[in-house]
Curated annotation (Swiss-Prot):
It comes from Influenza A virus (strain A/Fort Warren/1/1950 H1N1). It is a peripheral membrane protein. The gene is M. One of its GO terms (biological process) is viral budding from plasma membrane. Most abundant protein in virion. When expressed alone can form virus-like particles in transfected cells. Plays critical roles in virus replication, from virus entry and uncoating to assembly and budding of the virus particle. M1 binding to ribonucleocapsids (RNPs) in nucleus seems to inhibit viral transcription. Interaction of viral NEP with M1-RNP is thought to promote nuclear export of the complex, which is targeted to the virion assembly site at the apical plasma membrane in polarized epithelial cells. Interactions with NA and HA may bring M1, a non-raft-associated protein, into lipid rafts. Forms a continuous shell on the inner side of the lipid bilayer in virion, where it binds the RNP. This is Matrix protein 1.
Length: 252
């Protein structure tokens, strides 16, 4: 796996699923391929994206700044600086300075990542802030190691939270989660459908599913009534893909 592929993997792991994630993935690919060289326009685009947390925007802004060649005097962006200040906690800043001193002596991506993984996400973000604000300088490889360690810390906590929700025994939470997943799957089906005859059928199935979820929410239904909703939709989607000659793995 190449360095940039690894960076892209880690960064995308902290971006919520949805159309925006696909858009961000495309921007990262373009940036890493040297196709997008207007850093200012890229940062303006990032700043106005909805849904993303300030920290995720800060990390993406840091990655774009590291990768896209820019004029020396280009102003640092406030939204990135604010996101990478470790919540203003002086303890985070102290740890960030200690980490920075270690990273300065490091020259490899994996070495930097290994060192950084023993620090909290707050300290890692603060250390990125130091580098972003030009208070410290490390090699691009080392900076990417720091980015990936930060993303790993964030993804770990997101995974723990997600696992808690998936394994919860609360029937109301499970019911709502199934309906949200069914609704999201229906939306994906509509986006994939295109304009063929079979597409009309897929659109109809997706539309009915969304209406059913809306009705279930409006009138209130038994927590078990949503069981199998997403699976039924996915079976329909796979049948549609087969007719269209598209072979895709299940994405349950």
């Amino acid at each position: 796996m190449s360095l940039l592929t690894e960076v892209e993997t880690y960064v995308l792991s902290i971006v919520p699923s949805g159309p925006l994630k696909a858009e961000i993935a495309q921007r990262l690919e373009d940036v890493f391929a040297g196709k997008n060289t207007d850093l200012e326009a890229l940062m303006e685009w990032l700043k106005t994206r909805p849904i993303l947390s300030p920290l995720t925007k800060g990390i993406l802004g840091f990655v774009f700044t590291l990768t896209v060649p820019s004029e020396r005097g280009l102003q640092r962006r406030r939204f990135v600086q604010n996101a990478l200040n470790g919540n203003g906690d002086p303890n985070n800043m102290d740890r960030a300075v200690k980490l920075y001193r270690k990273l300065k002596r490091e020259i490899t991506f994996h070495g930097a990542k290994e060192i950084a993984l023993s620090y909290s996400a707050g300290a890692l973000a603060s250390c990125m802030g130091l580098i972003y604000n030009r208070m410290g300088a490390v090699t691009t490889e080392v900076a990417f190691g720091l980015v990936c360690a930060t993303c790993e810390q964030i993804a770990d906590s997101q995974h723990r939270s997600h696992r808690q929700m998936v394994t919860t025994t609360n029937p109301l939470i499970r019911h709502e989660n199934r309906m949200v997943l069914a609704s999201t799957t229906a939306k994906a089906m509509e986006q994939m459908a295109g304009s063929s005859e079979q597409a009309a059928e897929a659109m109809e199935v997706a539309s009915q599913a969304r209406q059913m979820v809306q009705a279930m929410r409006a009138i209130g239904t038994h927590p078990r009534s949503s069981a199998g909703l997403k699976d039924d939709l996915l079976e329909n989607l796979q049948a549609y893909q087969k007719r269209m000659g598209v072979q895709m793995q299940r994405f349950k």
